[in-house]
């Protein structure tokens, strides 16, 4: 490896470039760390001024940045300038108080600082021996959170189950489906994999279908059971029973059911207790996906949404969605940890150690797809300690209150309608001045197209950002409160902007028709 001569160093210093032979010099770390914290504090203070959805065109960054990496070091000051001028314009600002799209990414000071500590320790926490504190803290915080959710004891370490922090719900579903697959194939033979069937609804997140593909489930054996408006688009147990019965009669093997508490499109809630009963008849693995709404269930008034979870095999929710824990942090609990371990464990010689052989420790590498893993428990622990249960509940309630406010504003305008019941902090609505409940054919197409155009015009301004869904054939706008910085004033401003653009679009269409 070559070295820089004194002339080169002098030239670098003269040009103001940062240079240090130690890439982790404590004093330089302190200096630059303060600069980055100040940069982010200013960003949070001013994020409301930025267009929420990035206004750049595809390929914009390639036109700005050099074609190759710099040969010599550049100062952090220079890099931060480039971030301000080139990167920030290309960010869709999920932390903006005017962000109402998808579901929120509700970061917090505690979540950020926990992530900072985790990154600073840079521990690779694949088994207990590789970082005992990381493993043991994870077992503790998942039990803490399981108790907050009033999960049955059998999901906690204290009751023979246990929790693990995955990256996302996609990983949680894939891990549990793999465990379910191997458990069944060990009974009926591995050559029978083509008979295994996976069940969700037509509202279930696409992660289920992706997991089924990866797990080797035949594409023809994936069932998206139809939902109906009469059930608020939640999965009905009797509809599931019909589909499962037909599969059994055809000689197929029901494997895995994924009910959802808070679907992505409309926050619909599947009927857990009845669905678990159907699954039990066929010895299916039931994984409850509460990625978004699980956070709300720490509040007693929302806990009923997961009634029936005692009949499930596993349960997960994303703390990085609505629990003030910075991305990524999916909390997964299983009743049978050994099923995960049997499907996912590897024990090469170089990982063998006395702690593992004692069988007194948890090795989380055997609860996930990858070997290496991050110290995710640190940020979740800090969030729960820094805010406390009472404040966490009140934060969640404040977001629900803002959603109720928006729901009331929509209902008061006769041109708009609420499309499905609001369960949590997301409102599905659309422009429909005729208020015909079941418009069909060309009329439905016109209403859908108007709402599509309205959403795009609102989003293109950068004043706020929403996303859409198609529910029962109806194109709807989704307004999800929950961004950490959002206040009631932002909700009211967003509604005024929507009304203004609806009126302008109506005028534009009317003018075009007249001429």
From Swiss-Prot:
Q: What does this protein do?
A: Catalyzes the decarboxylation of L-tyrosine to tyramine, which is converted to norbelladine, a precursor to all Amaryllidaceae alkaloids such as galanthamine, lycorine and haemanthamine, and including haemanthamine- and crinamine-type alkaloids, promising anticancer agents.
Q: Which GO terms describe its cellular component?
A: cytoplasm
**Which residues of this UniProt protein bind substrate?**
105, 205
**Keyword Repeat: yes or no?**
yes
A single GO BP: carboxylic acid metabolic process
Q: Which InterPro entries match?
A: Aromatic_deC, PyrdxlP-dep_de-COase, PyrdxlP-dep_Trfase, PyrdxlP-dep_Trfase_major, PyrdxlP-dep_Trfase_small, Pyridoxal-P_BS
| Listed EC numbers | 4.1.1.25
Pfam families (UniProt xref) = Pyridoxal_deC
Instruction: Name the organs or tissues of expression.
Output: Mostly expressed in bulbs, and, to a lower extent, in stems, roots, leaves and flowers.
Q: Which UniProt keywords apply?
A: Alkaloid metabolism, Decarboxylase, Lyase, Pyridoxal phosphate, Repeat
- What class does this enzyme belong to in the EC scheme? lyase
PROSITE patterns assigned: DDC_GAD_HDC_YDC (PS00392)
Q: Which GO terms describe its molecular function?
A: pyridoxal phosphate binding; tyrosine decarboxylase activity
Q: Which organism is it from?
A: Narcissus pseudonarcissus
Query: What does the record give as cofactor?
Result: pyridoxal 5'-phosphate
Where are sequence repeat segments found?
A: 81-138, 141-192
Top-level taxonomic group: Eukaryota
- List positions binding pyridoxal 5'-phosphate: 169-170, 264, 318
| Catalysed reactions, as listed in the record | L-tyrosine + H(+) = tyramine + CO2
Biochemical pathway: Alkaloid biosynthesis
**Name this polypeptide is given:** Tyrosine decarboxylase 1
């Amino acid at each position: 490896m070559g070295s820089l001569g004194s002339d080169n160093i002098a030239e670098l210093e003269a040009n103001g470039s940062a240079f240090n032979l130690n890439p982790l010099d404590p004093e330089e770390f302190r200096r630059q760390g303060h600069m980055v914290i100040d940069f982010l504090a200013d960003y949070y203070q001013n994020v409301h001024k930025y267009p929420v959805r990035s206004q750049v065109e595809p390929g914009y960054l390639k036109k700005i940045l050099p074609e190759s990496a710099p040969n010599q070091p550049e100062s952090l000051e220079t890099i931060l300038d480039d971030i301000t001028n080139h990167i920030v314009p290309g960010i869709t600002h999920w932390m903006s108080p005017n962000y109402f799209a998808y579901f929120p990414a509700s970061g917090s000071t505690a979540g950020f600082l926990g992530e900072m500590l985790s990154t600073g320790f840079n521990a690779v926490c694949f088994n207990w021996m590789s970082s005992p504190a990381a493993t043991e803290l994870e077992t503790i915080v998942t039990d803490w959170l399981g108790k907050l959710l009033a999960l049955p004891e059998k999901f906690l370490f204290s009751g023979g189950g246990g929790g693990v922090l995955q990256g996302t719900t996609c990983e949680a579903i894939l891990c549990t489906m793999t465990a379910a697959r191997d458990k069944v194939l060990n009974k009926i033979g591995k050559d029978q994999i083509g008979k295994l069937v996976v069940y969700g609804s037509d509202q279930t997140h696409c992660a289920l279908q992706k997991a089924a593909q990866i797990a080797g489930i035949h594409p023809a054996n994936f069932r998206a059971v139809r939902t109906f408006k009469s059930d608020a688009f939640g999965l009905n147990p009797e509809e599931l029973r019909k589909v499962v019965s037909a599969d059994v009669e055809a000689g197929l093997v029901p494997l895995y059911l994924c009910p959802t508490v808070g679907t992505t499109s409309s926050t619909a809630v599947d009927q857990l207790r009845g669905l678990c009963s159907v699954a039990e008849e066929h010895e299916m693995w039931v994984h409850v996906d509460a990625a978004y709404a699980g956070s709300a269930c720490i509040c007693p008034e929302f806990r009923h949404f997961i009634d029936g979870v005692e009949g499930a095999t596993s349960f997960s929710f994303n703390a990085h969605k609505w629990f003030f824990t910075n991305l990524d942090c999916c909390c997964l609990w299983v009743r049978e940890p050994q099923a995960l371990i049997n499907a996912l464990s590897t024990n090469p010689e170089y990982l063998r150690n006395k702690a593992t052989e004692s069988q007194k420790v948890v090795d989380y590498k055997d609860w996930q797809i990858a070997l290496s893993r991050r110290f995710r428990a640190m940020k979740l622990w800090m969030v729960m300690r820094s805010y406390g249960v009472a404040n966490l509940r009140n934060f969640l309630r404040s977001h629900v209150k803002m959603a109720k406010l928006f729901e009331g504003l929509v209902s008061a305008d006769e041109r708009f309608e609420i499309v499905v019941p609001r369960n949590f902090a997301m409102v599905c609505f659309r422009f429909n001045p005729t208020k015909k409940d079941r418009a069909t054919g060309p009329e439905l197409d016109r209403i859908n197209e108007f709402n599509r155009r309205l959403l795009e015009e609102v989003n293109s301004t950068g004043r706020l950002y929403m996303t859409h869904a198609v529910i029962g054939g109806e194109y709807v706008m989704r307004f999800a409160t929950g961004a950490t910085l959002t206040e009631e004033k932002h909700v009211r401003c967003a509604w005024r902007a929507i009304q203004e653009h609806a009126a302008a679009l109506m005028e534009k269409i009317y003018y075009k028709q007249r001429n």
